[in-house]
């Protein structure tokens, strides 16, 4: 059964309680989820690693936003988010620990709207903590609803 492209962020795109031994492994998991959602071609995952090697995608508040390079848009089938939570944290380098990865696949410039909405959410430290420590998918979907609405 193929995934239904029913929105920027769906329950199928949220994975809680994940584990990754490294930043590379976490980025790989993010990319593989985007592929399984039918949002990107497998080649997009390689560009996510390239982006991470050129500039960190760590955003702050324990959140990273893995995404591909500008040139990788050709591998994007539809704009989608994938959210992976790492309760034990992942070393993102430079003393930064990530507990939540919000992977972005954008066909155009939608990623700028997504980043803007995400920044507003993370500026609220209570919401940021709620997001990092979420125990169920619905909580994540509710907290990230403002981002999902940027698709409309």
Language-model features: locations:
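Cytosolic covalent-transfer regions centered on His/Cys nucleophiles
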Residues: 1-152
């Amino acid at each position: 059964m193929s995934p239904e492209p029913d929105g920027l962020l769906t329950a199928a795109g949220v994975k809680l309680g994940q584990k990754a031994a490294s930043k590379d492994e976490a980025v790989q998991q993010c990319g593989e989820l985007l592929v399984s959602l039918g949002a990107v071609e497998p080649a997009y995952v390689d560009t996510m690693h390239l982006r991470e090697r050129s500039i960190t995608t760590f955003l702050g508040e324990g959140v990273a936003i893995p995404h591909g390079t500008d040139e990788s848009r050709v591998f994007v089938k539809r704009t989608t988010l994938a959210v992976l939570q790492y309760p034990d944290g992942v070393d993102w380098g430079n003393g930064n620990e990530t507990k939540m990865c919000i992977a972005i696949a954008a066909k155009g410039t939608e990623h700028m709207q997504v980043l803007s909405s995400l920044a507003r959410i993370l500026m609220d430290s209570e919401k940021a903590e709620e997001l990092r420590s979420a125990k169920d998918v619905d909580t994540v979907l509710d907290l990230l609803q403002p981002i999902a609405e940027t698709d409309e």
